[in-house]
Amino acid sequence: MKRLLLLVALLTAVPVQAERYDFGQGVAAMACSMLDSGYSRREVENVLDSLERFIIRDGISARGQRQMVKGYNYQTARLGCELEYRD
């Protein structure tokens, strides 16, 4: 149930400037927080994959994708999260 609520919260935030570095950083911070809260890596990666599909489906530009990924990868490295590198 918590996972479903978290996914809904993420999806409602997607249209708000998804094409920015800080959005990617925010997603990474949320994902790292999920890991710290006891979610398995697989559960977190599944949420991230779902979010990625929704963002792409909504028509994010290639430039926006690069910015988001750069922010995400920067933040996961900075926080030392054991999450997959996105490209």
Q: Where do the language-model regions lie?
A:
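Low-complexity, intrinsically disordered regions enriched in charged/polar residues
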Residues: 1, 21, 38-45, 62
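Sec-dependent signal peptide recognition
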Residues: 1-7
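N-terminal signal peptide c-region/cleavage motif recognized by signal peptidases
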Residues: 13-15
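Immediate post-signal-peptide N-terminus of mature secreted/exported proteins
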Residues: 18-39
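Compact alpha-helical subdomains of small soluble proteins
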Residues: 42-87
